[in-house]
Design a protein with these regions (language model features):
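A conserved acidic beta->alpha catalytic loop
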Residues: 87-96, 117, 144
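Short aromatic/hydrophobic "clamp" motif used to bind/position activated sugar donors
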Residues: 137
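N-terminal membrane-anchoring/stem segments of glycan-assembly enzymes
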Residues: 1-45
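Membrane-embedded multi-pass helical conduit in multi-pass membrane proteins
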Residues: 4-5, 32, 44-45, 252, ...
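Short, acidic, metal-binding catalytic loop of nucleotide-sugar glycosyltransferases
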Residues: 69-80
């Protein structure tokens, strides 16, 4: 066996293992760990913290009224809760609708904060948070609808001082659509993993539609970053906890067409190189314990799918050319077939083919994110996906 074959085989096996670990291996390991450790009891507090619910919006005139009606219909003590709409320089009727709602609900503490410049969700949150004096800050999107007890559930999870962040469960309501169903299937599995991570120590990422943090521990991140990924990472690296409460529920529509879902995934990967760099910092199990294991398996290995698929393909081509073994040619054929099925899945009504297609556009979106990072095209703002409203 030549040197190039040996190197190619090592690269192939390593990249395939990381792909397997990202998509199946880590989740399997979590479930094994959970079985061995047993299900830990989740603690809750009865203490009623003062709360501000922040709704972040940019040109959300179609949903902001319904969101306000939804969020004020909660079972939290009225004297302990405030509402704040952080408008990211909305240019439609969003601000006017909110102002009119405030006039018609003078018995409630509702305020509107407007950013002078359109610099994205995180910037609007950073600016609006400066006016918050509550103990707990709940943050949510304009198109995510809460259950009546969602705020209470989020707040009840702050049972210990080391818990700085709580993420709720996002449920999709339009799973009859192929694209939405693919996202929902992935998300259901994701929530199981978060639940296990949370019980053991801490989660590695949240969800921008439904989460809360201690206001005193709010971190001002650069506008290009998002709280979903940055907050749990920050707290985890500082030995604090970000946890998941499956009973704090929000409902939302998933993207119903590939274009909307692809744009969302590209946006999610706008700082993918930073995430990979952060993963390297977290890769110290002696210092960070369980968080190090969780972050590598749940985040870093997934952030590396784009390069591992490329390495697996290139090394497989080399092995198929230089090796006499038919095995490598069969594996290469299987890889090519996989991508062909992914292309066919775009128009197919087959759930399996569409899942393969959905996976392929996820990898493509990572490449797009890498391109934007390198060329400086990554930006903190985006246009909302109309199919999610």
């Amino acid at each position: 066996m030549s040197l190039i074959q040996i190197i190619s085989m090592i690269v192939f096996l390593f990249s395939v293992f990381l792909i397997f670990w990202a998509m199946l291996g880590y989740d399997i390991s979590l479930r094994i760990i959970n079985k061995i450790r047993g299900k830990a009891k989740t603690e809750h507090t009865e203490y009623k913290y003062s709360v501000t619910v922040m709704i972040v919006a940019h040109n959300e005139e179609d949903v902001i009224y319904d969101k306000l009606v939804n969020v004020i219909d909660n079972n939290y003590p009225k004297d302990k809760i405030k509402y704040l709409v952080a408008s990211d320089n909305s240019t439609d009727q969003t601000n006017a609708i909110v102002e009119n709602f405030i006039k018609n609900h003078e018995d409630l503490d509702i305020k509107l904060y407007t950013s002078k410049n359109h610099r994205g969700k995180t910037n609007a949150q950073n600016e609006a948070q400066k006016s918050v004096d509550s103990e707990i800050l709940v943050m949510t999107d304009a198109n995510a609808m809460f259950k009546n007890d969602t705020v209470s559930e989020l707040v009840s999870s702050f049972a210990n001082d080391d818990i700085k962040y709580v993420c709720g469960a996002l449920r999709y309501i339009n799973t009859e659509n192929m694209t939405a169903d693919s996202e929902s299937s992935y998300w259901d599995r994701e929530l199981v993993s978060r639940s296990i991570e949370s019980r053991i120590k801490t989660i590695t990422a949240g969800n921008g539609a439904i989460y809360a943090c201690r206001n005193s521990d709010y971190v001002t991140f650069p506008p290009i970053e998002c709280h979903d990924s940055s907050m749990p990472y920050y707290y985890g690296m500082h030995g604090q906890r970000a946890i998941f409460n499956e009973n704090a529920i929000a409902y939302e529509k998933a993207g119903e067409n590939t274009e909307d879902e692809y744009k969302r995934k590209v946006r999610m990967n706008r700082v993918i190189l930073l995430h990979i760099k952060n993963g390297m910092k977290a890769f110290n199990v002696f210092k960070h314990g369980w968080f190090s294991y969780f972050y590598f398996g749940h985040r870093t290995s997934r952030y590396l799918l784009w390069i591992n698929h490329l390495l697996a393909f290139i090394s497989n081509v080399i092995l198929a050319v230089y090796s006499d073994l038919i095995f490598w040619k069969i594996i290469l054929g299987a890889q090519i077939l996989f991508y062909i099925l992914g292309i066919l899945g775009r128009k197919s009504k087959s759930k399996l083919l569409h899942m393969i297609y959905y996976y392929c556009i996820t990898i493509l979106a990572q490449w797009h994110g890498i391109f934007n990072c390198i060329t400086g095209k990554a930006k903190p703002t985006w246009e909302k996906a109309e199919s999610t409203r």
